From Swiss-Prot:
Keywords: ATP-binding, Chaperone, Coiled coil, Nucleotide-binding, Proteasome. The lineage of its organism: Bacteria, Bacillati, Actinomycetota, Actinomycetes, Pseudonocardiales. InterPro entries: AAA+_ATPase, AAA_ATPase_domain, ATPase_AAA_core, ATPase_AAA_CS, NA-bd_OB-fold, P-loop_NTPase, Prot_ATP_ID_OB_2nd, Prot_ATP_ID_OB_N. Residues 28-103 form a coiled coil. This is Proteasome-associated ATPase. Residues 1-33 are annotated as: Disordered. Residues 601-602 are annotated as: Docks into pockets in the proteasome alpha-ring. ATPase which is responsible for recognizing, binding, unfolding and translocation of pupylated proteins into the bacterial 20S proteasome core particle. May be essential for opening the gate of the 20S proteasome via an interaction with its C-terminus, thereby allowing substrate entry and access to the site of proteolysis. Thus, the C-termini of the proteasomal ATPase may function like a 'key in a lock' to induce gate opening and therefore regulate proteolysis. Homohexamer. Assembles into a hexameric ring structure that caps the 20S proteasome core. Strongly interacts with the prokaryotic ubiquitin-like protein Pup through a hydrophobic interface; the interacting region of ARC lies in its N-terminal coiled-coil domain. There is one Pup binding site per ARC hexamer ring. Upon ATP-binding, the C-terminus of ARC interacts with the alpha-rings of the proteasome core, possibly by binding to the intersubunit pockets. Consists of three main regions, an N-terminal coiled-coil domain that binds to protein Pup and functions as a docking station, an interdomain involved in ARC hexamerization, and a C-terminal ATPase domain of the AAA type. It comes from the Bacteria. Pathway: Protein degradation; proteasomal Pup-dependent pathway.
Length: 602
């Protein structure tokens, strides 16, 4: 089988014959060369295969560097874009600012009237002009007296508000419009009483105006814009409806009945007064010592009147007005100012009373401004103030539904012309409370709902009302007993007579309230110290001693007779006062200095 194998002799013979025909190269060398070539290719491929991971790493590193570079360039590009955008916006803003600064100035005017051809009348630069309106402005929204902005061509380009500054003028009369559908007009007077006619701005024309109102006026445009509150009167007048009731006042039943007859009956039963041809009183004078309830009564009258009017008319909102005049503040160093304030106060009262609402004008400390004419030491301002009040009370202009109530500690100093019948008709003396009156006043401040000490409650079987009544009884007995402890003063009259005055002679509702307040404060301190809550009788008795001790220095005056008159002691002139206080830390018999001619500062 040798002849079947490749490369055998038969093949060799064929090869020799073929080679002999044209090929002289050795076939084995060619194969060897091809084998070497293939081996080199394999080695090259092996080297490439070996070098491939390293190249991949290099390429990956270059790719990462390229990506980072791209990110940096992108971020820088974004910053440049943002910077360019900001620069562009700044350039635009600067261009707008330059354009705005380069614009000609705009003028302002006051709108007067509008017309169908899209033109309006305005008042600008002291002239009345008819100008066009920009399409961006709604001509129907313009109101008389409103400010408008004009461009360089005098075209209305913007609507403003209403003027808020100007002169304050007094309204004399509201006039009819100058033309049909035109602006309302008013006659006003300036600070020099110079009268002029002005237009009323639309917001003001919609309000109800009365003669005497203060108006804000632009004299150049000729418009009145708003009603100005009368601050000078508001400072002097407390316009309110008090919440004090007659039930809150103790010990003054007779006086309350008198003032109700004088004030409430004419308002509530005007038909009966007309039937009997009885004229209601114009004024009431409440006089008496300090702290006895004069102001409280006046407030209670206003509150009661409001309730009575509401019940009579069926209107829940019906009310009365209480004009509380701060007497000494009426005085003004400028001549005629005090009289003008009085006129304005009564004008305000007439305005409030014009619709049937009761108005009470209350003058506290009446002697300070309406004292007897000719009694002034440094000046005689009362010579004009008193006649002004008299003319307001019973002058040509009547006071309908207005009643004047005056309160004073020194009624002897008030001008007699004010006190005569027909002016302050009713004079009610508010006296110091007696023992029964003091009990009634105590009952207003000591009520069963207060904390009461357990020992005091146990004494009356836990009955709180009985305990309170007993506490009040003990306290009043201690205050009003004629004992050495209650002696206050020894006064010597001009005729040589002497009289001992007790603390009860100077008691008042204000003093009783102060005693109760002291006792309540002592009860609070007792709770903090002993942890035993409740008010006791001893607290009230100690409060009486403390109150009397504090009042020991009060009569120290260089004119004892004047002090006695203010305190309610009338009669023989007092020339000498000696204290008789024997309370704690007090020495009996201290003499009050009654020196005279001590100078104006005393």
């Amino acid at each position: 089988m040798q002849h079947d194998l490749p490369g055998g002799r038969h093949d060799e013979a064929d090869s020799s014959e073929t080679g002999g025909a044209g090929t002289t190269e050795n076939p084995s060398s060619e194969q060897a060369r091809q084998i070497r070539f293939l081996e080199e290719e394999v080695a090259l491929l092996r080297r490439k295969l070996t070098d491939s991971p390293r190249q991949n790493r290099v390429l990956e590193q270059r790719l990462a560097e390229a990506n980072e570079r791209v990110s940096q360039l992108t971020e820088r590009n974004n910053k440049l874009v943002e910077t360019l955008r900001e620069a562009r916006s700044q350039l635009l803003a600067l261009r707008e600012e330059v354009d705005r600064l380069a614009q000609p100035p705009s003028g302002y005017g006051v709108f007067i009237a509008a017309y169908d051809d899209n033109t309006v009348d305005v008042f600008t630069s002291g002239r009345k002009m008819r100008v066009a309106v920009s399409p961006t402005v709604d001509i129907q929204s313009l109101r008389r007296g409103q400010s408008v902005r004009l461009n360089e061509a005098l075209t209305v380009v913007e609507v403003g508000g209403f003027e808020s500054t100007g002169e304050v003028c007094t309204l004399r009369e509201v006039l009819a419009p100058d033309t049909e559908g035109g602006s309302a007009r008013a006659l006003v007077a300036g600070h020099t009483d110079e009268e002029r006619v002005v237009w009323l701005a639309d917001p003001l024309a919609e309000q109800t105006l009365k003669p005497g109102d203060s108006l804000l006026v632009d004299p150049k445009a000729g418009y009145a814009y708003e009603r100005v509150p009368k601050a000078e009167v508001e400072d002097l007048v407390l316009e309110e409806v008090p919440d004090v009731r007659y039930e809150d006042i103790g010990g003054l039943y007779r006086q309350i009945e008198q003032i109700r007859d004088a004030v409430e009956l004419p308002f509530l039963h005007a038909d009966l007064y007309t039937q009997y041809k009885l004229r209601p009183p114009k004024g009431v004078l409440l006089y008496g010592p300090p702290g006895c309830g004069k102001t409280l009564i006046a407030k209670a009258v206003a509150n009661s009147l409001a309730k009575q009017v509401a019940a009579a008319t069926g209107e829940k909102d019906a009310k009365s007005y209480f004009l509380n005049i701060k007497g000494p503040e009426l005085l003004n160093k400028f001549v005629g100012e005090t009289e003008r304030h009085i006129r304005m106060i009564f004008q305000r009262a007439r305005e409030k009373a014009s619709d049937g609402t009761p108005v009470i004008v209350f003058f506290d400390e009446m002697e300070s401004i309406f004292r007897t004419r000719g009694s002034g030491v440094s000046s005689d301002v009362e010579t004009t103030i008193v006649p002004q009040l008299l003319s307001e009370i019973d002058g040509v202009e009547g006071l309908e539904n207005v009643i004047v109530i005056g309160a004073s500690n020194r009624e002897d100093m008030i001008d007699p012309a004010i006190l005569r019948p027909g002016r302050l008709d009713v004079k009610i003396k508010i006296e110091r409370p007696d023992a029964e009156g003091a009990k009634d006043i105590f009952s207003k401040y000591l009520t069963p709902d207060l904390p009461i000490h357990a020992d005091d409650l146990a004494e009356f079987g836990g009955d709180r009302q009985a305990t309170i009544d007993a506490m009040i009884q003990h306290t009043v007995e201690r205050m009003y007993e004629e004992s050495e402890e209650n002696r206050f003063l020894e006064v010597t009259y001009a005729n040589g007579d002497k009289e001992v005055l007790y603390f009860r002679d100077f008691n008042s509702g204000a003093m009783i309230q102060n005693i109760v307040d002291r006792a309540k404060k002592a009860a609070i301190k007792s709770v903090l110290e002993t942890n035993q809550p409740g008010l006791r009788v001893q607290h009230l008795l100690d409060a009486i001693v403390d109150e009397f001790a504090e009042n020991e220095d009060l009569p120290n005056t260089t004119n004892p007779d004047d002090w006695a008159r203010i305190s309610g002691k009338k009669g023989e002139r007092i020339v000498y006062i000696r204290t008789l206080v024997t309370g704690k830390n007090q020495e009996s018999g201290r003499v009050i200095d009654t020196a005279t001619n001590t100078g104006q500062y005393l």
